[in-house]
Amino acid sequence: MRSALFICAFLACLALTSSRAANAKASDPPNVPNIGFVLYTKSYAPGTLNARWMYGNAYSGPGIATGGQTIGFAGRYHVRYFYDSGEFSDEYDLVIEKNKDSYKASWIAKGKVAAIGVGMEVENGLAIGWRRVAD
């Protein structure tokens, strides 16, 4: 009787541990480097940019930045990103500043800079490499 109870308790603990481990793997893949890339292209809507982004080798999807200037890429935007599945990912206030032939970008959430990047214009767009800022 004791051994049957012990086996049931052991299997219950094993099942609980396995499900927690699976959830951790699904939400945060191991070895994801803190580096991303985004390509912004002009939308037909004035002051709007379409985005195609990726983070490390684990996440990617589309996005849309609104509220910017009608000419060029520099300006202040509100950007929303989505996963390839269509599920919402993140949203930020995005500041893009031009300096000669290069650009500096800052993604701001809740009044704090969450990510920074640098980029340059490419054919039909603005390419930016970025990383999350450590707390």
What are these regions (language model features)?
Residues 22-135:
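Central antiparallel beta-sheet cores of small beta-barrel/beta-sandwich binding domains
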Residues 1-4:
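Positively charged n-region of N-terminal signal peptides that target proteins for export
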